[in-house]
Amino acid sequence: MRSYETMYILSPDLSEEERKGLIERFKNLIIENGGEITNFDEWGKRKLAYLIDKKPEGYYVLMNFNSDSKVSQELERVYKITDGVLRYLIIRTDE
């Protein structure tokens, strides 16, 4: 298993229920595919450096997890097709 870090920015227009639902969906995707979440941190709503989809703010979430590469690829695929995800980044943090 490898260590990964992902940060994603959710649309500020989402309701609290929608936002929590997306966060749980991403967490469950990792766990159900044999990964484990080692750190989870919601940074909350922050101002963006530049407009993304004409939005000046975004809701930031940071997660560290251990899994094999197929889980990170599936997570990236889900980020791409999910409405409400403005930006995302997944990096491998193996040392």
From Swiss-Prot:
**GO terms classed as biological process:** translation
The organism's place on the tree of life at top rank:
Bacteria
Q: GO CC terms for this protein?
A: cytoplasm; ribonucleoprotein complex; ribosome
Q: Which Pfam family, any one, appears in the UniProt record?
A: Ribosomal_S6
Q: Tell me the lineage of the source organism.
A: Bacteria, Bacillati, Bacillota, Clostridia, Thermoanaerobacterales
- What is this protein identified as? Small ribosomal subunit protein bS6
State the SUPFAM superfamilies in the record. Ribosomal protein S6
Q: Quote the InterPro entries the UniProt record gives.
A: Ribosomal_bS6, Ribosomal_bS6_sf, Ribosomal_S6_plastid/chlpt, Transl_elong_EF1B/ribsomal_bS6
Q: Which UniProt keywords apply?
A: Ribonucleoprotein, Ribosomal protein, RNA-binding, rRNA-binding
Keyword rRNA-binding (UniProt): yes
Homology family:
Belongs to the bacterial ribosomal protein bS6 family.
Q: Which organism is it from?
A: Thermoanaerobacter pseudethanolicus (strain ATCC 33223 / 39E)
What CDD domains has UniProt attached to this entry?
bS6
